[in-house]
Amino acid sequence: MNNFSQENNLNKKNLLKLLIEKSYKKGNFILASGKESAHYLNCKPVSLNGKGLQLISNLFLELMDPSSKAVAGLTLGADPLVSGVILTAASKGLLLDALIIRKETKEYGTKAGLEGPTLKEETVVTVLEDVVTTAGSAIKAIKKLRENNFIVKEVLSIVDRKEGGYEALKEHNIQLKSLFSIEDFLMNNVQN
């Protein structure tokens, strides 16, 4: 899987504990993809928690392609992720920008579909996601970024549900790198 520094290996273990405690549920759920599932992961209780966001941000920063000059994601799930990663990067002396991708282009003002600093064309941007199922949200973000002449090589996610997202992204020449897969939750005999 991913080879992390010793510190981030510990961060990853602590993050999994937090996700199991605050984000994972068993039951009958309809996912954003429209699929039914007996397992639900809502990472927002962890990504909107100071310690959780710190863990995610450190792990994403180490996992991210070093050629990336910005991170981006579709609002709302990616909002804390992109903010956390650029703040963590800044604390380490790294320059990284962030873009928030609107689900719908504004109907007023500048009619922007992207929010954030003005970046040069062909800037390499990494897309951040909380959970990837079919990768529909990530693909929407990638298309919007590519329409604006940015280069997207990868998507980083907290969890890959292993339901076709990896393959869908591969069709768009995008590498999916995930901190965890659904198996990590199932192997830990989560009883929620």
Curated annotation (Swiss-Prot):
Its EC number is 2.4.2.10. One of its GO terms (molecular function) is orotate phosphoribosyltransferase activity. Orotate binds at residues 133, 161. Its cofactor is Mg(2+). Disulfide bonds: none annotated. The keyword Membrane does not apply. It comes from the Bacteria. The keyword Cytoplasm does not apply. InterPro entries: OPRT, Or_phspho_trans_dom, PRibTrfase_dom, PRTase-like. GO terms for biological process: 'de novo' UMP biosynthetic process; pyrimidine nucleobase biosynthetic process. Keywords: Glycosyltransferase, Magnesium, Pyrimidine biosynthesis, Transferase. Belongs to the purine/pyrimidine phosphoribosyltransferase family. PyrE subfamily. Catalyzes the transfer of a ribosyl phosphate group from 5-phosphoribose 1-diphosphate to orotate, leading to the formation of orotidine monophosphate (OMP). PANTHER family: OROTATE PHOSPHORIBOSYLTRANSFERASE, URIDINE 5'-MONOPHOSPHATE SYNTHASE. This is Orotate phosphoribosyltransferase. It comes from Prochlorococcus marinus (strain MIT 9515).
